[in-house]
Design a protein with these regions (language model features):
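Short flanking/linker segments adjacent to small metal-binding domains or redox-active Cys/His motifs
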Residues: 89-129
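C-terminal, charged low-complexity interaction regions
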Residues: 117-217
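Generic ordered-secondary-structure signal
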Residues: 12, 21, 28-34, 74, ...
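Generic alpha-helix detector with strongest preference for long hydrophobic helices that associate
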Residues: 31, 38, 96-100, 173, ...
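Short, well-ordered helical secondary-structure segments
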Residues: 4-7, 17, 37, 103-106, ...
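N-terminal cysteine/histidine-rich coordination modules
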Residues: 1-83
Length: 217
């Protein structure tokens, strides 16, 4: 039977999920199955997790705990896309000053921004440095995160997926425009492509050329 090593937990982080910062419900084994240890780049671990993070990803065959964390972040982003879209469609001030009427809208005004901030915090949370047997766990990572609207996505591709769903973009058009403008102009690409939500293969090329002409390219 394999030995799993407990990570050291700083006093300020006791009872905290290492993956998202919420209160932890349990300590999970990583990887889940002994035979998956063969692909690990570090010792097998036990680590505190909340209920959602411990169950949101079905597989645990990853080369490191950091890649497993990335998978959890991606799953949380997908599951809570509607909550995260609040921060993309509103600012806190806009919500407070909006003239939405009715009990349902009043409830939305009160709860929407705190819900977004809570989920934003969970997605952005990086956990504390992992120490096992007095040794800092150092593993090379090829992760290339991307930040948009205050949320740190695991990758540019995840940010694109979120933007397409949130702003009802034509994905083929958006990714093509983004490739021309570059990821540093992610917001501009969204603004340009929001004008053309429903495209067909026959008119997508014309729209793309129209966008390029509008920005002088």
């Amino acid at each position: 039977m394999a030995t799993f090593y407990a990570v050291e937990i700083p006093f300020n982080y006791r009872s905290t999920c290492w993956f998202c910062g919420e209160p932890s419900d349990k300590k999970i084994k990583f990887p889940q199955y002994d035979y998956e240890i063969n692909i690990l780049d570090h010792l097998p671990l036990t680590i505190p997790s909340c209920k959602e993070c411990s169950s949101i990803v079905n597989r645990s065959a990853f080369t490191s705990i950091y890649h497993y964390r990335d998978a959890i972040k991606k799953a949380l982003t997908k599951k809570h896309q509607k909550v995260l879209s609040i921060g993309s469609n509103w600012t806190k001030k806009e919500l407070e000053e909006s003239e939405l009427e009715g009990s349902a809208f009043e409830g939305f005004k009160r709860s929407a921004w705190p819900m977004f901030e809570m989920m934003q915090g969970r997605i952005n949370y990086q956990g504390w440095p992992l120490v096992v047997n007095n040794q800092l766990l150092v593993v090379d990572s090829d992760n290339d995160s991307f930040e948009f609207d205050g949320v740190i996505y695991v990758s540019l591709d995840d940010a694109v997926t979120h933007a397409v769903k949130t702003f009802f973009l034509d994905e083929a058009l958006f990714t093509r425009v983004l490739s021309v403008l570059g990821k540093n102009k992610f917001s501009q690409a969204i603004r340009l492509c929001r004008l053309y939500p429903n495209l067909t293969a026959s008119n997508r090329e014309d729209v793309f050329l129209e966008i390029l002409d509008s920005i002088g390219l």
